[in-house]
Regions:
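Short coil/turn segments at secondary-structure boundaries
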Residues: 127, 159-165, 187-192
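Active-site proximal loops enriched in glycine and acidic residues that flank catalytic Cys/His/Asp
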Residues: 20, 75-77, 134, 159-161, ...
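Structural motif
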Residues: 133-149
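Aromatic- and carboxylate-enriched substrate-binding clefts and catalytic-loop regions
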Residues: 1-134, 168
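Loop/helix patches that line or flank the sugar-binding groove of alpha-linked glycan CAZymes
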Residues: 138, 142, 169-183, 187-190, ...
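Catalytic cores of secreted or luminal carbohydrate-active enzymes
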Residues: 147-183
Length: 243
């Protein structure tokens, strides 16, 4: 791992995103770790170290190997508190979407609001991309982009060059320029009543966002088959009064 990361830095890359390390280590996604992180009886080869120590050692090897080249580290599918100080940025939520607006709200807006306390303390937080163009109306996606651009956190955009109309491309450019300026972290104001905060303080000024479509939020299982199974298991347990 150390040699691989060092080589990538020597090639001239300035940002390395390492992903899927938690599922690689334990064989399960976070949503599958209901009570147990791995299959019954499974363990690391070195039983003299705890799982936390082994994970932290991995993050440290990646971080230290990137230092000589000055390469920045973005962790994804990582365990946040163990990565504090060992990654420059951390993707703090699940994937947002350029197709499913609900997914962007659940894993973008919610993540930005409720993982914000980690920003600047553990690492710079990244609530995932503004995904365009896709099936999401620009009037909604532009709001997500504006919030990210003024949030004080990292902003990433997934877009095919030349695919946007001129006015949208200009607006996107303004968002990216705004995000490049250092600013105070955004503060959700209605977070105690709303899991998808609509009222925010940006640069000291209150601003309201309107996330919901006229017909309401189109709710589905945005996490796919894994979360569908998790939901069935939790629902069955609740029905059986096991928890």
């Amino acid at each position: 791992m150390r040699k691989t990361v060092s080589r990538i830095g020597e090639w001239g890359f300035r940002l390395l995103k390492h992903d899927f390390t938690t599922v690689d280590l334990f064989g399960r996604w976070g949503g599958e770790m209901l009570g147990e992180m791995a299959a019954d009886g499974w363990h690391f080869a070195d039983r003299t170290k705890t799982a936390a120590e082994i994970i932290t050692d991995l993050y440290r090897v990646i971080y230290d190997a990137a230092k000589p080249s000055g390469m920045l580290i973005l962790g994804c599918n990582t365990i946040g508190h163990l990565g504090a100080g060992l990654m420059h940025m951390n993707r703090t939520g699940d994937d947002t979407s350029g197709l499913m607006w609900e997914r962007t709200l659940r894993f973008g807006v919610n993540t930005l609001a409720f993982r914000m306390p980690q920003h600047g303390a553990f690492f710079d937080t990244d609530a995932d991309c503004m995904g365009i163009p896709g099936g999401i109306d620009w009037q909604y996606n532009r709001q997500w982009g504006r919030l990210l651009s003024l949030s004080g956190t990292s902003m990433f955009v997934s877009v095919k060059p030349g695919s946007l109309p001129q006015d949208q491309e200009k607006e996107l450019g303004e968002m990216l320029r705004a995000n490049a300026l250092r600013r105070a972290p955004a503060e959700p104001l209605d977070w105690q009543e709303n899991g998808l905060p609509q009222d925010w303080k940006l640069d000291g000024k209150a601003e309201a966002f309107h996330w919901y479509e006229p017909g309401g939020l189109r709710v589905g299982c945005a996490g796919g088959p894994i979360w569908e199974r998790v939901w069935r298991e939790v629902s069955s347990a609740l029905d059986a009064k096991d928890i």
